[in-house]
Regions:
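N-terminal low-complexity or simple alpha-helical regulatory segments
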Residues: 1-43
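Alpha-helical bundle regulatory/interaction domains
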Residues: 43-138
Length: 138
């Protein structure tokens, strides 16, 4: 829909697909990024294999941050997947939010301005009515 994380540090992507086999969603994630997912339909999971796991059910949203290494994630077979991802390079967000660092939620502040870059998986939660409205308008 918009942008390119590698070139300008930001991208908004609409995903609408059906799959017959489980899909390795994690291979689409960008290194050193913070990504927000608004999941309208389909089942997905981010994390696991010794770390925190968050399940994306229809109507859920959440975020995950990548360091240099991969982050396991999958999309379930036989589902109709519809979701939006807002993808940002950590560097882009650091530059844009440096003057507002104190206003950020503690976990987001740690992801962007902490001393150690690491993979982070936040718990998915139900989308608000406003978030649903924005996604439905795309």
């Amino acid at each position: 829909m918009y942008g390119d994380v590698d070139k300008i540090g930001v991208a908004i992507e609409w995903h609408d697909f059906r799959i017959e086999r489980s899909f390795n969603w994690g291979r689409t994630f960008h290194p050193n990024s913070l990504e927000f997912c608004l999941n309208l339909n389909g089942h997905g999971a981010v994390g696991g294999v010794g770390g925190t796991r968050s399940d994306y059910l229809p109507g859920n949203c959440g975020y995950y941050a990548l360091a240099d290494g991969p982050l396991p994630a999958s999309r379930r077979a036989h589902d109709h997947h519809q979701f939006v991802t807002l993808e940002f390079s950590r560097e882009h967000l650091r530059n844009e939010l440096a003057q507002n660092e104190a206003d950020l939620q503690p976990e987001i502040r740690r992801i962007l301005f902490g001393r150690k870059e690491e993979n982070v998986v936040a718990p998915a939660r139900p989308m608000t009515l406003q978030q649903r409205s924005v996604v439905a308008s795309l």
